Regions:
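Glycine-rich phosphate/pyrophosphate-handling loop used in enzymes and phosphotransfer proteins
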Residues: 1-219
Length: 219
């Protein structure tokens, strides 16, 4: 879909969200999209972890822990169409990018399945990248269909996504992989593999949030 149509679609989703009855995404306080207390809970707290990928270990920087308010806000964006809340997560993603040394590297969001895109009408990683004032570069596409990752353990997740992505460009470019949440790192690892196979230089991976189940180093 052309970039201008994507932007229009996201703007329409934001406008629709403003017209609907609203409550705080973090605590359900009425008549406010995000209350002051919950907004403060989204203050960046960057953390680093590493994932294994063909070609070497990759650092993954996340701006928040995926729990509490952060988890509820992300779910509201993904499952309730509340795209305007992405603005509140922009500082966390920006902090992760800064710690990752992204600089002027190309930001490559994980692709969204056709089914998810049809259901939501927008791509969450792309939406988040735009909210930090950057342009997402769709250099990855699905080579095959994958199953739902929810409920799978680490090994099952890795098998589910193995060889599922292919790079469509990026050879010789410095790239940073972007997603909303990292759980086991299987999807990010597959993205790194595909980009490296296509000749890209992967600087790091970044996410808005990381599940607390993985060890992370706070900085």
């Amino acid at each position: 879909m052309p970039e201008i149509l994507v932007a229009v679609r996201e703007a329409c989703a934001d406008a629709l969200a403003l017209l609907l009855p609203v409550s705080c995404a973090g605590c359900d306080e009425p008549d406010v999209a995000l209350c002051e207390r919950c907004a403060l809970a989204l203050a960046p707290a960057p953390r680093r972890q590493s994932i294994e990928a063909p070609g070497g270990v990759v650092a993954v920087w996340s701006g928040l822990a995926f729990d509490g308010v952060a988890a509820r806000v992300l779910r509201a964006i993904k499952e309730e169409g509340r795209t305007s809340l992405a603005e509140a997560l922009a500082p966390a993603l920006a902090a992760a990018l800064a710690h990752a040394g992204a600089g002027d590297a190309v930001l490559v969001p994980l692709p969204t399945s056709r089914r998810s895109y049809r259901r939501r009408g927008y791509r969450v990683p792309d939406l988040l990248v735009r909210r930090v004032g950057r342009r997402p570069s769709r250099l990855l596409r699905y080579a095959r269909r994958t199953g739902d990752q929810r409920g799978l353990d680490r090994d099952a997740r890795a098998r589910n996504v193995a060889q599922s992505l292919v790079a469509t460009g990026g050879a010789g470019q410095r790239v940073v992989v972007v997603d909303d949440v990292v759980t086991t790192g299987a999807s990010l690892g597959e993205a790194v593999r595909a980009l490296r196979a296509g000749g890209a230089v992967v600087v790091a991976a970044v996410t808005v949030a990381a599940t607390p189940r993985r060890r992370a180093t706070r900085r």
